[in-house]
Amino acid sequence: MGGNEPENEVAVTIAPYRALSLDGGGMRGIYTAAFLSRLSGHFANGRGKGALDLGKGFDLIAGTSTGAIVASALANGNSMDEVVSLYRKHGAKIFPHRIAGKRSALARVSKGGKYVREGDTALRSALADVLGEVSLADVYHKRGISLAIPTVLMSEHRALVFKKTPKSGSRDDKYPLVDICMASSAAPIYRSLAAVTDPNCPDGPKQIFADGGLWANNPILVALIDALANAAPDQPIELFSLGTCPRPEGEHISEDEVHRSMLDWSLGADVGPLSISAQEFAFDNMARLLAGALSDCGRSIRRIRFPNKPVPASMMPFLALDDTRPEAMDRLIAQANTDADLTKSACDDPHNAEGQMIRRLFEGLEPAPEIPLSSLLASN
């Protein structure tokens, strides 16, 4: 050996940059929260400790629409059980009238404004109870968590991402999480557009936003791009992506059925689920291909979409975006528990690479805070 070479060279392991991507899906957000609660609970019980701080396990959390609500709660330090309770307690007020076919769509023609106005008030109140007045800058500076929340700025009809990361500047620092969630979840037809005060010009006109799911219902590419922008050049990236138990999509259409009217599209209500389904497939595969290409160039990027098994056929009647029936929520929670249990089984298999990646994430989590950031700031 050469005289200048160290005798005991120790390999240095660089901690990965971890990002979480959370899909939109209306009331199916209760599935997302229940899944994370169940899986986190398994690891907490295994360590003989109380609840774990899942939000702190990630450098970046991206969430769209209902995923923005879950993302904000994680960043704020709320338990996922609190989010499940939000959907259970307030879901029927947020979506006071379900669109289930042509007849219910027609019923919305005269009373639709009333329904979405009531839902807007209910959602803002529910979010304020959970998130308080916490801003993007608060969770970044006090919790060390970056957020990226897609929406649509209606004044320019362009995509916009509310974000606070080490390289994002200060544009969005003062926006409260409540306003950001309202902006990202303002689904046309199902809910009101979101009128939000611009904190950089509080005396000016309000900004109007529409649901981020119009362009990024699966925000995995948003998460990947921000991870690439903020991770160190030699830092491995681990990207975790979670859906909302989306229903199997597709329909057989005969040639004589292609001339659909507005009523055949339930006055537009059926377009949203079609867009969501197409986006989720496209964005997930684009992220997979991009991550693979970058990995081939020497950048370490690992990506997990969990759970990734087919949705049981028995779940089909309970997967509408605005289904607030107690039995629908019960079924979503039950399915989340089943899927989380299967994911934990994968984590217990030493030969399952994806399971081991998830296991390392959860085993490194800190205990959950005694109170969320919103309560801490309110008491000061």
Where are these regions (language model features)?
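Patatin-like phospholipase
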Residues: M1-N380
